[in-house]
Swiss-Prot record:
The keyword Zinc-finger does not apply. Pfam families: Nitrate_red_del. This is Tat proofreading chaperone DmsD. Its main location: membrane. GO terms for biological process: chaperone-mediated protein folding; protein maturation. Keywords: Cell inner membrane, Cell membrane, Chaperone, Cytoplasm, Membrane. It is a peripheral membrane protein. It comes from Escherichia coli (strain K12). Required for biogenesis/assembly of DMSO reductase, but not for the interaction of the DmsA signal peptide with the Tat system. May be part of a chaperone cascade complex that facilitates a folding-maturation pathway for the substrate protein. Monomer and homodimer. Binds to the twin-arginine signal peptide of DmsA and TorA, although the latter binding is controversial. Interacts with the TatB and TatC subunits of the Tat translocase complex. Also interacts with other general chaperones, such as GroEL, and proteins involved in the molybdenum cofactor biosynthesis. GO terms for molecular function: signal sequence binding. The lineage of its organism: Bacteria, Pseudomonadati, Pseudomonadota, Gammaproteobacteria, Enterobacterales. GO terms for cellular component: cytoplasm; plasma membrane. It is found in: Cell inner membrane; Cytoplasm.
Amino acid sequence: MTHFSQQDNFSVAARVLGALFYYAPESAEAAPLVAVLTSDGWETQWPLPEASLAPLVTAFQTQCEETHAQAWQRLFVGPWALPSPPWGSVWLDRESVLFGDSTLALRQWMREKGIQFEMKQNEPEDHFGSLLLMAAWLAENGRQTECEELLAWHLFPWSTRFLDVFIEKAEHPFYRALGELARLTLAQWQSQLLIPVAVKPLFR
């Protein structure tokens, strides 16, 4: 049985998307990736048909008065309400809270699988970016079954809705394109999954 997450391009794409959603654009982790996506040529290396990526190449390079750092602050930090919060429990919990039941279920699954993953101080583990980074780490360490369980049980049940709202509310060409790239890539992965995606009610 071949897992799609065994492919080298899976972990690379998951790590790129995860870092860009999780880290500030000027950070050591994200800045080189921002530079790549705002240049020509990355689309030839991405595991999707180039024709579907052509509009994103232009969008990533589109100039905007709002800087990448300002957009990041507005979309991921605040101080105002985030237009599309990147934590799973905000979408999956009836009260739309951080550290909700879905976060606790993820923690329990991680404990059962012996997965330890460093998070920023006091941040929930179910951040969209950190889940992608965790998936990349699992794939790179030959843990394909756990990687695909993570996607099917703890990310895909809410990620489509999160990305739809993120793209709609991003209001910055780079982050709108990033949301679209993530939506296309995750849809491709979901179509290749060997286990069914958990069906969970969404509350946003």
